[in-house]
Amino acid sequence: MRIEKIETYKLIAPIEPSFGWSQGWAEKRHLLLVKITGDDGTVGWGETLGVPSQSVLHEILAPLVIGQDPMNRSGIWERMFQRSGFYLSNSAVGLGACGMSGIDIALWDLAGKAAGIPVCEMLGGRVREQVAVYATGLYYTENETHETLCKEAVGYVEAGFKGMKTKVGRLSINQDVERVAAIRKAIGSDIHLMIDANQAYNVSSAMRIARKLSDYDIFWFEEPVNTQDLDSYLFLKSALPMPLAGGETLKTRYEFEKFLSRKAYDHVQPDVAICGGLTDMQRICHMANMCGIQVNPHVWGSQISIAATVHLTSTLPPCPQAFYTVPYIQDPVFELDRTPNPIRDTICSNPFQPENGLITVSKDPGLGIEILEKEVKKLCVEGGYTVCSQQA
């Protein structure tokens, strides 16, 4: 099989209610979908978070992929990486890596369908049949009260989640501590509770809030400082009274290497739609395991990203190695976004659904999901469709 056509769809959907975090406020959800068609008509789907990466994907990357064999994913990845590095510099970070991620995920889906096997088997086979997920929600909302916040948190417990994550960094330190304290009281001591600052603090502020939260059994403190500030992560790793997590915005194994080799995290969080797709994320995960750092992937997209992450996470070895393994302790977990997202909720006919905090790995070919192209086209903005069939 040869790759015949690459299409992209820029999707935007308004949401209600809107919500915020330390770096912004969301009133819409954005996504870039990638559809790759083989010369036999087989289709694979991918996605990336960087909507501005559409022009990079269409003009620079797609022509390099047309005419290639989708079974040669490593070769295609290196071909894209070399060209991205040449045009965009700095080891294909930024929009280049986002575009590569979308194409790469679609190639794995396409290849799996062509071979008649699920992506997890193409990645080496499952270590576990089910993957643990935690609820990501508890954002800042308009007219928020501790009562509404705690009602949301208790809802996640009742839905079977064994862990959840809330935001810090938008309010004063004392106000955020009060939010976290209210959540902990509402959910009890048996549920894992994580906090995410989205890079809101400097080292001293991160230490201040961490000390104030030390009595609330925080499972990890995510992105307290700028994602590229290695020295601050190294300091906080040794000083914080709770584990440190990060890495969701890093691109390719080359950016991850400097953090992993120095053991700057307790938990690393690559995002398959940002870091370089399944091809490079698998390398990143192996690197992390060798460094004794648990992988707990970041996910912030549609069922395409969820499916890709389920398949890859099912193949990851326990960290640390153990005969009897427990999610959160040895087995990886990844986040399941619970905020409003019409794109996630409408474009797939057979979405992955959690039961008691676990998602069962699909055994269907490729990613194991069916994309409803009619719904994709409904959400595609005017001028947001591109098609490339011309080889570089």
Task: Map each language-model feature to its residues.
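Proline-centered loop/turn at the N-terminus of a beta-strand
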Residues: 118, 132, 192, 243, ...
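Metal-dependent enolase-superfamily TIM-barrel catalytic cores that perform enediolate-based chemistry
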Residues: 124, 129-240
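A cross-domain feature marking catalytic cores of carbohydrate-active enzymes
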Residues: 48, 93, 135-137, 166-168, ...
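Conserved, mostly hydrophobic/aromatic
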Residues: 3, 41, 61, 103, ...
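Shared catalytic-loop signature of beta/alpha-barrel
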Residues: 56, 211, 217, 228-245, ...
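Metal- or metallocofactor-binding catalytic centers and their adjacent structured scaffolds
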Residues: 36-114
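Structured beta-strand/loop patches that form or line metal/cofactor-binding pockets in enzymes
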Residues: 1-45, 49, 340-347
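Extended hydrophobic packing segments that form well-structured cores
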Residues: 363-392
